[in-house]
Design a protein with these regions (language model features):
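Generic secondary-structure microfeatures
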Residues: 19-22, 43, 52
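Short, conserved charged micro-motifs
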Residues: 24-30, 80-82
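Compositionally biased, intrinsically disordered low-complexity regions
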Residues: 18, 23-26, 111
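Short, well-ordered beta-strand segments in beta-rich or mixed alpha/beta enzyme
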Residues: 11-20, 56-84
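A broad, low-specificity signal for short, low-complexity segments enriched in glycine/proline
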Residues: 7-12, 29-35, 66-70, 109-110
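Glycine-rich beta-strand-turn "strand-cap" elements at beta-sheet edges
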Residues: 1-10, 51-64, 93-111
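An amphipathic, aromatic/His-enriched active-site/gating alpha helix that lines ligand/cofactor pockets
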Residues: 34-46, 64, 73-106
């Protein structure tokens, strides 16, 4: 584990994978992008990008089973933590969570 002082000073990369429910139509899957777009105005976000899983070749280390991934960069851990409690974020999760059956989050200190 990294020293706490380093984690507090570094930028945070928030990487999220979403597995959408299989019964969703192609149109509903594309419409899910509204979830990501609704997060963009949140003041704590430094960068935000998202996309569908790439159809890359099958390899033992590759997992393309998710539908969408989201990558957000925060200036620091405090901004990350504030984002988690932000009303816009919480409202978006409440509105769109009916579309997924699994979510995995990886938070990383980056330089």
């Amino acid at each position: 584990m990294i020293e706490e002082s380093k984690a507090e000073k570094g930028q945070i990369q928030h990487f999220v994978m979403f597995w959408l429910k299989p019964q969703l139509t192609k149109a509903e899957i594309i419409q899910f992008e509204s979830f990501f777009e609704s997060l963009k105005p949140i003041k704590y976000i430094k960068t935000l990008s998202y996309g569908l899983a790439a159809n890359t070749p099958v390899r033992p280390v590759t997992d393309n089973s998710f539908t969408y991934s989201l990558t957000i960069t925060f200036a620091n851990i405090a901004d990350h933590n504030a984002y988690q409690e932000d009303k816009t974020h919480l409202d978006a999760v409440e509105k769109f969570s009916k579309n997924w059956y699994r979510v995995v989050v990886h938070d990383t200190v980056i330089s």
